[in-house]
Amino acid sequence: MRFGREDFAYSLPPSDRALAKDDFIWVDIGCCMLASTSDVNRIAKAGRVTDEEQSIYTQVRNITTATLSAIRPGMTGADVYGAFEAFAKQTELGLPSATASRIGHGSGRNLTEPPSIAATSKEVIHEGMIIHVEPKYEMCGGVFQLEEVAVVTKNGAEFITTLSAERFPEILL
């Protein structure tokens, strides 16, 4: 879990800082069941969400779900990344910063395993794989990243996460 404004690097050390009004909250939650691992992330804001923040949230949610919905068996990680680029370029957001070299991954026995969803990934996606899509946009002092997870079926991706809320969640202090 990270909260604050501006700096959402995964590698930051823990802090005693208290949650404050207008902080962005980013949570990445993992689990393990029957030797399989997975994770999902969600965001919220401590305070009222602005119209601009809601617009960004909605666009990131739409890009994420459209990318995952486009997955079919036989695609490579690069094919999925190409779909992500096409969806992102259709929005006001465009592509995220250079941190978006990888926007997703598989999971199973390990939390992060092939295929990587990246521009250079030649790894092939097969029916039965679990795929995570999580493009990360850092803007307006916050992080906008909603990780959605699906199992790949012969007909495409079937979401196995409860989709992120349509409205950017607010925690009123």
Question: How would you name each of these model-derived features?
Answer:
Residues M1-L173:
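Active-site neighborhoods and metal-handling regions in enzymes and metal-associated proteins
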